[in-house]
Amino acid sequence: MKITINQASEFVGKEVTIGAWLANKRSSGKIAFLQLRDGTGFMQGVVVKAEVGDDIFATAKALTQETSLYVTGTINEDTRSPFGYEMAVSGVEVISESHDYPITPKEHGTEFLMDHRHLWLRSNRQHAIMKIRNEIIRASYEFFNKEGFLKIDPPILTGSAPEGTTELFHTKYFDEDAFLSQSGQLYMEAAAMAFGKVFSFGPTFRAEKSKTRRHLIEFWMIEPEMAFYKLEDSLQVQENYVAFLVKAVLDNCRLELDRLGRDVSHLEKMVAPFPRITYTEAIERLHELGFDDIVWGDDFGAPHETAIADSFEKPVFITHYPKAIKPFYMPEDPENDQVVLCADMIAPEGYGEIIGGSERIHDLETLQARMEDFDLDQEAYSWYLDLARYGSVPHSGFGLGLERTVAWISGTEHVRETIPFPRLLNRLYP
């Protein structure tokens, strides 16, 4: 019977066949240990010469790294194995032999591994990170479905963008100018006026010339929008959502977290509610910590976010940023017209902002005035202004960056490892 590695627990004591690749191999005299992977997991196969005969043992010893094969044998429990099971091999059939596999078990530099990203994905570490990424995506759909949100797919090619045009990828749309989407937010606002609570999940593109461990040129975002929600309502959704994601990974990816050496004691503290401080309070705290390079009105850099987050064991909301450093669609605080009703969620352990969100302006005259302040072409945004013309309501939304969230939960240092094929400032290959 053919099974997959993740089904091994159901077949203890039975002879089965697994289609796999040889991740690694070692031999000791008359025993060969095969490290097998099949995409669902990793398992050791033990080949004993006295039990399989000379021919099968010779085949096993001659196997090269990443050769594909069918391995037949009996599944046994093994408490020494991280997986908990191993196979006593009785047969080996080579499907396709691998020659001179470039990523050997020795240490390799980052650029070499990135040049071979199509192969690096096969490694134990990358497998664990991608499984955690998949679980976060799966849990996101579960959370928003349970909360009554409708999945909406905004366009990737747009003629306008919510953040301006300085960091957009330009392309031609037949005889018109078009841009790769930085965010689906404006379209999601339109959808919220039709369906109440909506969310999207898709790629976004930002032509930022940043080379930090937090930045990608192409990344994926979850973007909910909610009609009749004020800022505090949105913050409660955000903290419940992030707590749900962390719990899902703890419940369903414990083996992967162990494989990555992640200290789960940090993650086990991630229960709502999360702390909240205002931008002004954050500036004051930074000054107390000796950060003299920042004044009220400046945006935070990575060191500032890290210093603020270090004061808390959970993600922290920084609310009420200065109006001058936030986008046009954010409404002023009725009690202070110098700040807007917004919040960024900063992850602990130095992982930075993982969510940005705000209330949205729903008054037509206010929205038009703000667009004038930003020198935006109102004709290009006429469809968006229609939302305010025809029965808009108070509404809020946010965007969660998938890769930064994966990096934080998995304990991965650089976001380049949290997406299968990263697009960076200096990398468009493979």
From Swiss-Prot:
Entry keywords, A to Z: Aminoacyl-tRNA synthetase, ATP-binding, Cytoplasm, Ligase, Nucleotide-binding, Protein biosynthesis
Single GO MF annotation: catalytic activity, acting on a protein
Compartments it resides in: Cytoplasm
Entry's EC annotation: 6.1.1.22
Record keyword Nucleotidyltransferase present: no
Catalyzed reactions per annotation: tRNA(Asn) + L-asparagine + ATP = L-asparaginyl-tRNA(Asn) + AMP + diphosphate + H(+)
One record GO biological process: asparaginyl-tRNA aminoacylation
UniProt-listed Pfam families: tRNA-synt_2 (PF00152), tRNA_anti-codon (PF01336)
Gene Ontology cellular component annotations, sorted alphabetically: cytoplasm
Source domain of life: Bacteria
Oligomeric form and interacting partners: Homodimer.
Family: Belongs to the class-II aminoacyl-tRNA synthetase family.
NCBIfam families xrefs: asnS (TIGR00457), PRK03932.1 (NF003037), PRK05159.1 (NF003483)
Protein name: Asparagine--tRNA ligase
Higher taxonomy: Bacteria, Bacillati, Bacillota, Bacilli, Bacillales
Gene: asnS
